[in-house]
């Protein structure tokens, strides 16, 4: 076992409980802060102040909004599946909390005289646990859309499922190069492998793919198609209110914090101090509680990227979003992994330095990526004089374009007949005559 695993194995129960409560409190506070910071930054981008009333600088605005949601009426649609409808927000929020348990926040510290590592659990396959939790979280969204009994939530949940499937592949491929260079699936081992250099500089294309994938995984702008207001009203949480609606917001922002912390762990050296601070005093800033500060600063930098993208980029069309994942990220990631594999093989033979090959490979991949965006899409020629009929590529049911006949209009006699008093035949009245069967009057 590694040193981190040995430290965590000796943790008493009370220390484990303290870590669990601390992680939960940290994620909740980060959620409240992220919502406030996002609204303030977006406000500045749009030349308005943002929330500035509740508390100093508006810091208590998120807490006030949470309390407001807690006291709102909890409405359940008539057609909703009761238990699935209630459990869906919990299923969406729980995996995000679990995923953070394997992320190292710092090194070895002393807590009430007990030596431990600032990490809840150390697993040999910790990276796969994070990937699995990211996949499980979409179940809550799918169940929410299906159980609401409404078409808009169902469409939003299906979009989210397709989105996660598409970008989970690209995210997993971005992990492969990191695993090859770190030689382990352990998150603490990956952090230790970056003490001499960040993987973001060594594996720039993997870093870029992960950043794009993490935005798609969290359903954030410009990839917020599952909850597109202009198309789906509110998406998968259209029919939710009160605390269940707040749970979806909590899950979204906890996911943002988790993927940002994972990006810090995989590509920015984790809790290690950035250069040149890491060289001060022989690495004294990488000991004690200092690593928490570096980890928090890097995580906040990634959270700012989410806000920046939301404030600057418009929402993509659904076909553009799928094309980006399947036609660009996945194929280029496979080419990048092949290049990294060749580099590792040549490095073992001392033929060429890995840095030279990685720089050359990154340039080639960047050129290919730019070229794919510049090449126009091939369009199928369309005939102006033909109408698509049933049996074509997109079958259209035959339409009866004949104008319907006007309904018969009632005459004055019929109208008077309907108004005849009781006991009087239609057409009879004052001054009317009745014809006898023999023709006499």
UniProtKB/Swiss-Prot annotation:
Keywords: Cell membrane, Membrane, NAD, Quinone, Translocase, Transmembrane, Transmembrane helix, Ubiquinone
EC number in record: 7.1.1.-
Localization per Swiss-Prot or TrEMBL: Cell membrane
Transmembrane portions of the chain: 13-33, 83-103, 123-143, 164-184, 197-217, 243-263, 289-309, 323-343, 356-376
Reactions performed catalytically: a quinone + NADH + 5 H(+)(in) = a quinol + NAD(+) + 4 H(+)(out)
Gene Ontology terms: biological process: aerobic respiration
A Pfam short name: NADHdh
InterPro entries: NADH_UbQ_OxRdtase_su1/FPO, NADH_UbQ_OxRdtase_su1_CS
Residues covered by region (Disordered): 400-441
GO MF term (any one): oxidoreductase activity, acting on NAD(P)H, quinone or similar compound as acceptor
Its membrane topology: Multi-pass membrane protein
Biased composition regions of type Low complexity, renumbered to the chain: 415-427
Entry superkingdom: Bacteria
GO cellular component, one term: plasma membrane
Sequence similarity: Belongs to the complex I subunit 1 family.
Complex and partners: NDH-1 is composed of 14 different subunits. Subunits NuoA, H, J, K, L, M, N constitute the membrane sector of the complex.
Cross-referenced PANTHER family: NADH DEHYDROGENASE SUBUNIT 1 (PTHR11432), NADH-UBIQUINONE OXIDOREDUCTASE CHAIN 1 (PTHR11432:SF3)
Purpose of the protein: NDH-1 shuttles electrons from NADH, via FMN and iron-sulfur (Fe-S) centers, to quinones in the respiratory chain. The immediate electron acceptor for the enzyme in this species is believed to be ubiquinone. Couples the redox reaction to proton translocation (for every two electrons transferred, four hydrogen ions are translocated across the cytoplasmic membrane), and thus conserves the redox energy in a proton gradient. This subunit may bind ubiquinone.
Name of this protein: NADH-quinone oxidoreductase subunit H
């Amino acid at each position: 076992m590694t040193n981190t695993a040995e430290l965590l194995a000796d943790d008493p129960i009370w220390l484990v409980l303290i870590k669990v409560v601390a992680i939960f409190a940290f994620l909740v506070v980060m959620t409240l802060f992220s919502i406030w910071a996002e609204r303030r930054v977006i406000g500045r981008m749009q030349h308005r102040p943002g929330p500035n009333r509740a508390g100093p600088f508006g810091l208590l605005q998120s807490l006030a909004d949470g309390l407001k949601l807690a006291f709102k009426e909890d409405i359940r649609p008539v057609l909703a599946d009761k238990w699935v409808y209630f459990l869906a927000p919990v299923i969406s929020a729980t995996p995000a909390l679990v995923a953070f348990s394997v992320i190292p926040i710092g090194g070895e510290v002393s807590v009430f005289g007990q030596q431990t590592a600032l990490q809840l659990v150390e697993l040999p396959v910790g990276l796969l646990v994070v990937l699995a939790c990211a996949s499980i979280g979409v179940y809550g969204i799918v169940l929410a859309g299906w159980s609401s009994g409404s078409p808009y939530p169902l469409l939003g949940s299906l979009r989210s499922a397709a989105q996660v499937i598409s970008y989970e592949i690209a995210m997993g491929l971005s992990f492969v190069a990191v695993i090859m260079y770190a030689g382990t699936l352990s998150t603490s081992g990956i952090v230790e492998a970056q003490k001499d250099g960040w993987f973001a500089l060594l594996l720039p294309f993997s870093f870029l793919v992960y950043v794009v994938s993490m935005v798609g995984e969290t359903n954030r702008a410009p990839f917020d198609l599952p909850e597109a207001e202009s198309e789906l009203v509110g998406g998968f949480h259209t029919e939710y209110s009160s605390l269940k609606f707040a749970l979806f917001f909590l899950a979204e922002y906890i996911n943002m914090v988790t993927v940002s912390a994972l990006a810090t762990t995989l590509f920015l050296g984790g809790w290690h101090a950035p250069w040149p601070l890491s060289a001060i005093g022989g690495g004294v800033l990488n000991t004690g509680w200092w690593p928490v500060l570096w980890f928090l600063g890097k995580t906040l930098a990634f959270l700012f990227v989410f806000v920046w993208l939301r404030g600057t980029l418009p929402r993509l069309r659904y076909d553009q979003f799928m094309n980006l994942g399947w036609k660009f990220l996945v194929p280029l990631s496979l080419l990048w992994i092949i290049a990294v594999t060749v580099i590792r093989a040549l490095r073992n033979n001392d033929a060429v330095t890995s840095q030279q090959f990685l720089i050359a490979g990154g340039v080639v991949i960047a050129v290919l990526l730019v070229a794919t965006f510049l090449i126009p899409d091939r369009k199928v020629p369309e005939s102006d004089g033909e109408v698509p009929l049933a049996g074509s590529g997109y079958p259209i049911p035959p339409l009866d374009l004949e104008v319907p006949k006007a309904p018969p209009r009632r005459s004055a006699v019929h109208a008077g007949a309907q108004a005849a008093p009781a006991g009087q035949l239609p057409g009879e009245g004052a001054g009317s005559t009745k014809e006898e069967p023999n023709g006499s009057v």
